[in-house]
Swiss-Prot record:
It comes from Oryctolagus cuniculus (Rabbit). The keyword Glycosyltransferase does not apply. Its main location: secreted. It is found in: Secreted, Extracellular space, Extracellular matrix. This is Fibromodulin. The gene is FMOD.
Length: 147
């Protein structure tokens, strides 16, 4: 479903779905129930949309390993990341803060990309990225003065 003119999340979607490609559309939000029942989903591609809000729609995606929300208009990181998540791509948004202990619920997280956002030191707690599993952290092109 990528490279279309979708303005909202399609549905209902097959529960057996493993990958969902909705990139390069015009989707502006992901309603809380939009991904309900997609327990087998391992990869969700939502990059290059107009998404401003995700809400808690990711909570039930217990098999999700990859979430790509890059090139959107998010101001906040998504609520309730799945515990199986390994790759989180949020570059080229307007994210200005990451809550303290935000990544504690995702112990398998290996890659986090938050480059080209609006992050400042006041929007990041000093222990935000303390994770023994993290292999790559990209915070380039933000407004950080220290790490």
């Amino acid at each position: 479903l990528d490279h279309n003119n979708l303005t909202r999340m399609p549905g209902p979607l097959p529960r057996s779905l493993r990958e969902l490609h909705l990139d390069h559309n015009q989707i502006s939000r992901v309603p809380n129930n939009a991904l309900e029942g997609l327990e087998n989903l391992t990869a969700l591609y939502l990059q290059h949309n107009e998404i401003q809000e995700v809400g808690s729609s990711m909570r039930g995606l217990r098999s999700l390993i990859l979430l790509d929300l890059s090139y959107n208009h998010l101001r906040r990181v998504p609520d309730g990341l799945p515990s199986a998540l390994e790759q989180l791509y949020l570059e080229h948004n307007n994210v200005y803060t990451v809550p303290d202990s935000y990544f504690r619920g995702s112990p398998k997280l290996l890659y986090v990309r938050l480059s080209h956002n609006s992050l400042t030191n006041s929007g990041l707690a000093s222990n935000t990225f303390n994770s023994s599993s993290l292999l790559e952290l990209d915070l380039s092109y933000n407004q950080l003065q220290k790490i």
